[in-house]
A protein has these predicted regions:
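Low-complexity, intrinsically disordered or signal/transmembrane-proximal segments
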Residues: 169-170
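Extended two-metal-dependent nuclease catalytic cores across DNA- and RNA-processing enzymes
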Residues: 1-124
Length: 175
């Protein structure tokens, strides 16, 4: 995955990595499981969902639990493992924090759901839906010339003609 969005860290596995572009260009960071564990102080990447649910994320309109910021969320993940673990063990909290967490349990559950990237959406895939029609070469050529894309015009024509020959050959239609 190539994204600057920390939410996607929840999807990192042994076989799925996150390539996080650096701000203002200039390379990227590669996040595997160890990097996610270190950044969020979690045991498993899927705990990022709980972490974000606890502390909230204003850029994604996730409210989080009132009074819980990054440090407290890391502490709670370490101590309770999940939002559910936190909410079922509020007796271990003290003072105002206990009151806030108990009073906002539903908000915490909602925040966790808002932080979860849904993977069980129905997706149908038919490769034919992605086949491109042949472009109107003359129209494309005219647009490129109007925009003075000389090299792009030459490259387009060269690659288009090559790919058309290859496609015809693969289909056994040697015109």
């Amino acid at each position: 995955m190539v994204t600057p969005d920390k939410d996607f860290a929840q999807l990192v596995t042994d076989h799925i990595f996150m390539y996080k572009p650096n701000s203002f260009g200039g390379g990227y960071e590669t996040w595997g499981i160890p990097e996610v564990q270190k950044k969020f102080e979690v045991e498993r990447p899927e705990q990022v969902i709980d972490f974000l649910g606890m502390m909230g994320d204003s850029s994604d309109n996730i409210p989080g639990l009132p009074g819980v910021g990054e440090k407290t969320a890391k502490k709670f993940i370490n101590q309770f493992g999940s939002m559910e673990g936190l909410l079922s063990n509020t007796d271990q909290l003290k003072g105002k924090m206990k009151e806030k967490v108990e009073a906002n349990a539903e908000l915490g559950r909602l925040s966790k759901e808002l932080a979860r990237i849904m993977l069980d959406v129905p997706v149908t895939f038919d490769a034919k839906d992605f086949e491109l029609d042949h472009p109107d070469v003359e129209k494309v050529k005219q647009i490129f010339q109007d925009l003075e894309f000389r090299r792009l015009t030459d490259n387009f024509l060269k690659h288009f003609l090559e790919s058309r020959r290859t496609l015809r050959h693969q289909r056994g239609n040697k015109e």
